[in-house]
Every structure is written in structure tokens, then in C-alpha cells.
């Protein structure tokens, strides 16, 4: 009997896919082991070789580390772009047309989809696109971060080493190599995108606008946006149901009633004149009057009232005139100097108040308007 699994891969021997889980691998292994076990097929020497291949395939695929090492070539070959490809394209990008660079970026984009990236990386488009639309594409690509695992870049097969310390050292070296390859790949892709952006022919087709043209363009864009907002508002207003407006009116009415009632209550506050405080109800005022602070302010106010009353009585007694003092000055009505020169003598005379006094009183009067005896002699 010829060996049906000759020159086959582990996945082909166990008849599973590369994304099959351990349960599916075990199920297929048991089925094939029962079918090709030598004890079930005595006298057939080829079954020993077939069964050995089945066991070897199962041992590899059931162990994660062995499976990764076995899949190195498969993982690498499922991607169309490797580090050396990006480096080569970057070195020749100035000599090739833009269409070739755009096609190469599309290969990068497809590789990320295969790697399971959820980022929607855009294409570079063609030369007919406006730079206004192409510029955001480059901005997104310049933040590129690959989802490729680069596990095929591992240097050592850890499972082949029996010494634990050596195996740990191999694992650290493999992790460093994988991390370096990921970082190197990201940097090369970003450099490639940056170079492609600089060489993009669509940059040269940008029309430079003057300040006036730019202002007019912004004004036109603002006008169109306002028009779209206005139409959207009208459409929304048109689709409003009458019931919704009724509910709004009821809510506004109840809100107005509550505000009005609050204004009425607040328009007549209950006030404590001692503490200069407002209260909402009579109960609050009564509780306040029983407080220590109110009683303290009340005692203080009573003391001030008594103090002011005593001072007022004292001032009244000190300002009391003697009984023989004249009630008013003989010249109670004063005449200003300006009136003296502008009014007639008769008018000025009418403003005087004449008081009958004796000659003795006239000559002995004080200096507030009366002549003394020397002045009288001078007049004579």
C-alpha cells in the first residue's frame, strides 16, 4: 500500500485548517489513528509509517510553541509585503511613477486586513483626485501600526532545547527579535508614506488663493452651511407632532404657574426688624424669636435706644435759653451785599425787623449789629 500522506504538511495530514482549534485537531487525530493503527491492520508495513506521521503531526499542532515554529513559513508567505520589500521600494520611490507607489500601498493595506486589523486604512487613489481629499489619507497612514505578529522572525526553536535556562534565554532573544522587526516595519512604512506624500503630483496642482478669494470661499461655504441648517430646521419643525407641542405648552403653563406662585409668596416676606432677616412663614419667625441670637440682638437694641434717649435729653437741657434772652435778633433778616446794590432802599427797608429798645440798651448792645457810644459820637 502506498503512503497517502507522503510529502504532506501537518495540517494536510490531520485534514484541518490553519485556524482550527485544539478540539477539532483532536477529533480528526482520533479518527485517523483508529483508521490507520497498525493493530487494526496487521501485516501491512506501510501503516506503521502512516501512523507515525499522524502522531508527529498531532504532537506539533497540539503544542502552541511547536505549532508557531512549524507555521513560520506559512505565516510569512500569507503576506505579500515583507521588511525587505518596503526597504527596496523606499530606495527606488523617486524613480517610479505614482501609480506604482499607490499599488504598493494597496498591498500593505491588504496585508493588514489579513492580519486582522480593524483600522479602515484608505487607498492613495489616483492622480485625478484633488489634494484636498488626498491629504487626510496621508495623515492617517502616517500613524500606521502593523497588526502582523512577525513570529516567523524568531531565531530559535525553544522546544528543541532541553535545558530550562537555555530555553528561557532563547525565548527572550526571540521576543526581542520579533519586537525589533515590528518596530522596523512600522518605521519603514511611515517613511515610505512620508516620501510618497512629498512626491505626490497632486500637491503641485493646488491652486493658491489670494486673501480675498479665500475670504470669499469661506463666506460661500458658510452661506451654504447656513442654508443646509435652515432647511434641516424647517424639516424638523414640520415633522413635529401636535401632541408634542401640546405637552410642551402644558409644561410651560405649569412652570409659569409655579413661578407666579413663588413670586407672590416672595413679594410679602415676613421680616424680623431686630435681626434684619426675612422668613417664609410665621412659624419660622416664631422659632427665630426664641433663638439666643435674636434675644441677644434684642437686648443690644434696647440698650442703644436707652442710651440715645439719655443723650437726647441731656442735649435738650444744655440748649435751653434763659428767660430774659431775646427771642430773636433785631435784624433777623439779613441782606446780602449783592441785594444791597441792586434793590431800592424801600425794598431793603421792608426786609428789616425793627425792635423797640431804649437808648441805654442801644449803646450797651453787643457787637452783633448795634452801635456803641463811641460810634454814636463819631456819627454826631
Curated annotation (Swiss-Prot):
Changing residue 352 to A: Impairs the interaction with atg8. Residues 9-74 form the J domain. A zinc finger (C2H2-type) spans 270-294. Its main location: endoplasmic reticulum. One of its GO terms (molecular function) is zinc ion binding. Residues 307-337 are annotated as: Disordered. GO terms for cellular component: cytoplasm; endoplasmic reticulum; phagophore assembly site. A motif (FFAT) lies at residues 361-367. A motif (AIM) lies at residues 352-355. It comes from the Eukaryota. Induction: Expression is up-regulated during ER stress by the unfolded protein response (UPR) regulator ire1. One of its GO terms (biological process) is meiotic cell cycle. Disruption phenotype: Does not affect growth neither nitrogen starvation-induced ER-phagy, but abolishes DTT-induced ER-phagy. The keyword Membrane does not apply. It is found in: Endoplasmic reticulum; Preautophagosomal structure. The modification Phosphoserine is found at residue 344. SUPFAM superfamilies: beta-beta-alpha zinc fingers (SSF57667), Chaperone J-domain (SSF46565). Interacts (via the AIM motif) with atg8. Interacts (via the FFAT motif) with the vesicle-associated membrane protein-associated protein (VAP) family proteins scs2 and scs22. The atg8-interaction motif (AIM) is required for the association with atg8. The FFAT motif (AIM) is required for the association with the vesicle-associated membrane protein-associated proteins (VAPs) scs2 and scs22. Reticulophagy receptor required for autophagosomal sequestration of endoplasmic reticulum (ER) membranes during ER stress. Confers resistance to ER stress by promoting the autophagic degradation of the ER (ER-phagy or reticulophagy). Acts as a bridging molecule to mediate the association between atg8 on the autophagic membrane and the vesicle-associated membrane protein-associated proteins (VAPs) scs2 and scs22 on the ER. May play a role in meiosis. This is ER-phagy receptor 1. The lineage of its organism: Eukaryota, Fungi, Dikarya, Ascomycota, Taphrinomycotina.
Amino acid at each position: 500500500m502506498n503512503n497517502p500522506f507522503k510529502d504532506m504538511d501537518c495540517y494536510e495530514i490531520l485534514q484541518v485548517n490553519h485556524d482550527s482549534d485544539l478540539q477539532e485537531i483532536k477529533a480528526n487525530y482520533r479518527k485517523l489513528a483508529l483508521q490507520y493503527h497498525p493493530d487494526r491492520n496487521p501485516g501491512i508495513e506501510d501503516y506503521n509509517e502512516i501512523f507515525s506521521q499522524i502522531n508527529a503531526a498531532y504532537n506539533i499542532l497540539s503544542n502552541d510553541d511547536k505549532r508557531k515554529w512549524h507555521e513560520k513559513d506559512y505565516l510569512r508567505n500569507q503576506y505579500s509585503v515583507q521588511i525587505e520589500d518596503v526597504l527596496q521600494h523606499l530606495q527606488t520611490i523617486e524613480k517610479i511613477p505614482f501609480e506604482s507607489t499607490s499599488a504598493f500601498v494597496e498591498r500593505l493595506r491588504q496585508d493588514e486586513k489579513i492580519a486582522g486589523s480593524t483600522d479602515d486604512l484608505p487607498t492613495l487613489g489616483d492622480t485625478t483626485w484633488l489634494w484636498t481629499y488626498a491629504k487626510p489619507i496621508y495623515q492617517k497612514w502616517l500613524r500606521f501600526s502593523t497588526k502582523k505578529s512577525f513570529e516567523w522572525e524568531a531565531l530559535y526553536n525553544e522546544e528543541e532545547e532541553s535545558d530550562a535556562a537555555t530555553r528561557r534565554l532563547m525565548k527572550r532573544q526571540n521576543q526581542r527579535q520579533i519586537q525589533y522587526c515590528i518596530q522596523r516595519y512600522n518605521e519603514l512604512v511611515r517613511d515610505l508614506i512620508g516620501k510618497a506624500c512629498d512626491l505626490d503630483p497632486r500637491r503641485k496642482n493646488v491652486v493658491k488663493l489670494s486673501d480675498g478669494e479665500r475670504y470669499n470661499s469661506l463666506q460661500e461655504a458658510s452661506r451654504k452651511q447656513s442654508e443646509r441648517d435652515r432647511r434641516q430646521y424647517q424639516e424638523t419643525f414640520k415633522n413635529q407632532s401636535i401632541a408634542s407641542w401640546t405637552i410642551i405648552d402644558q409644561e410651560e403653563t405649569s412652570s409659569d404657574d409655579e413661578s407666579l406662585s413663588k413670586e407672590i409668596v416672595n413679594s410679602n416676606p415676613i421680616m424680623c426688624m431686630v435681626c434684619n432677616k426675612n422668613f417664609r412663614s410665621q412659624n419660622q419667625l416664631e422659632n427665630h424669636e426664641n433663638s439666643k441670637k435674636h434675644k441677644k440682638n434684642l437686648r443690644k437694641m434696647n440698650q442703644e435706644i436707652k442710651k440715645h434717649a439719655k443723650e437726647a435729653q441731656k442735649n435738650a437741657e444744655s440748649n435751653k435759653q434763659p428767660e430774659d434772652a431775646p427771642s430773636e435778633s433785631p435784624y433777623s433778616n439779613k441782606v446780602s451785599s449783592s441785594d444791597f446794590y441792586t434793590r431800592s432802599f424801600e425794598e431793603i427797608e421792608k426786609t428789616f425787623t425793627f425792635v423797640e429798645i431804649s437808648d441805654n440798651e442801644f449803646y450797651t448792645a453787643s457787637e452783633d449789629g448795634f452801635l456803641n457810644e463811641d460810634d454814636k459820637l463819631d456819627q454826631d
